[in-house]
Curated annotation (Swiss-Prot):
EC identifiers of the protein: 1.5.1.5, 3.5.4.9
Keyword Oxidoreductase set for record: yes
Gene label: folD
Organism encoding this protein: Polynucleobacter asymbioticus (strain DSM 18221 / CIP 109841 / QLW-P1DMWA-1) (Polynucleobacter necessarius subsp. asymbioticus)
Catalytic activity, reaction form: (6R)-5,10-methylene-5,6,7,8-tetrahydrofolate + NADP(+) = (6R)-5,10-methenyltetrahydrofolate + NADPH; (6R)-5,10-methenyltetrahydrofolate + H2O = (6R)-10-formyltetrahydrofolate + H(+)
Subunit structure of this chain's protein: Homodimer.
Full protein name: Bifunctional protein FolD
């Protein structure tokens, strides 16, 4: 029997309705949630992601500012613009779309964003707060993954969770969230020996490597929840994840589709973080 789908589009629709309702309340108090999105260069994937984020803001009643810059933009110019946005009371969240051109140090840029406006949750102070279980903002993709697990009331406490991919954006914060929810967590990376030995033991398997279909069906435990964070374009133009969906769906109990799984949830949790930043700003 095929796995049940963890439908990110359906859950996003429900959550965005709640976000829009809360945004209307805070806007009525004179604080309209505002998000500034900065994109440097003309990376086609970045352009698509940015357009989707701006449209999502408009759909829930947020004020959004899209700031596109040429790839030649200097690092100091970008830092100066971030400083201006940090001081702008109409902006509650600042997002710098990654990747940045090679001449710009992404770490320096991300740490220039005021922590209270760091709605991506990448600032070192927010990462540290997450580590000790007191997050200001949870990184959007792991946050969305946790919401998907919550939506099926999955019993995380005591479960064996395996994360393939150890990035600061997904793997590490995902591990912290699952650990805090009571799971026993293993993080695998490119140096991990016998990856299948670990993945086949996972009740919850989260894959975020950027490698198309690298996790095959025979690497998955029967009945596992499989969350595929990857989105890759194949030579024929089709999109696929980091998991071989067609094989995995006959082994897993639950699985996220690609597209339509984690992707829409990432944007939805960006909206949630921006809303919460605005709600905090509205309090006297």
């Amino acid at each position: 029997m095929p796995a049940q789908l963890l439908d990110g589009n359906a859950l996003s629709k429900k959550l965005r309705a709640e976000i829009a309702a809360r945004a209307a309340i805070v806007t009525a108090k004179g604080v309209r949630p505002g998000l500034a999105v900065i994109v440097v260069g003309d990376n086609p994937a970045s352009q698509v992601y940015v357009r989707n984020k701006v449209k999502a803001c408009e759909d829930v009643g947020f004020h959004s500012v899209l700031e596109p810059y040429p790839a030649e933009l200097g690092e100091e110019e970008l830092l100066a613009r971030i400083a201006t946005l940090n001081a702008d009371p109409a902006i509650h969240g600042i997002l710098v779309q990654l990747p940045l051109p090679e001449h710009i140090a992404a770490e320096r840029v991300l740490e220039a964003i005021a922590p209270e406006k760091d709605v991506d949750g990448f600032h070192v102070s927010n990462a540290g707060a997450l580590m000790v279980g007191k997050p200001e903002f949870i990184p959007c993709t792991p946050y969305g993954c946790m919401k998907l697990l919550e939506s099926i009331e999955y019993p995380i406490r005591g479960a064996r969770a395996v994360i393939v991919g150890a990035s600061n954006i997904v793997g590490k914060p995902m591990a912290m969230l699952l650990l805090q929810a009571g799971a026993t967590v293993t993080i695998c990376n490119s140096k991990t020996r016998d990856l299948a030995h670990h993945t086949k033991d996972a009740d919850i398997l989260v894959v975020a490597t950027g490698k198309p279909k690298m996790v095959s069906g025979d690497m998955i435990k029967n009945g596992a929840v499989v969350i595929d964070v990857g989105i890759n374009r194949l030579p024929d133009g089709k999109l696929c994840g980091d998991v071989d969906f067609d094989a995995a769906k006959y082994v897993a109990g639950w699985i996220t589709p690609v597209p339509g799984g984690v992707g829409p949830m990432t944007i939805t949790m960006l909206l949630m973080n921006t809303l919460e930043a605005a709600e905090k700003a509205s309090k006297p």
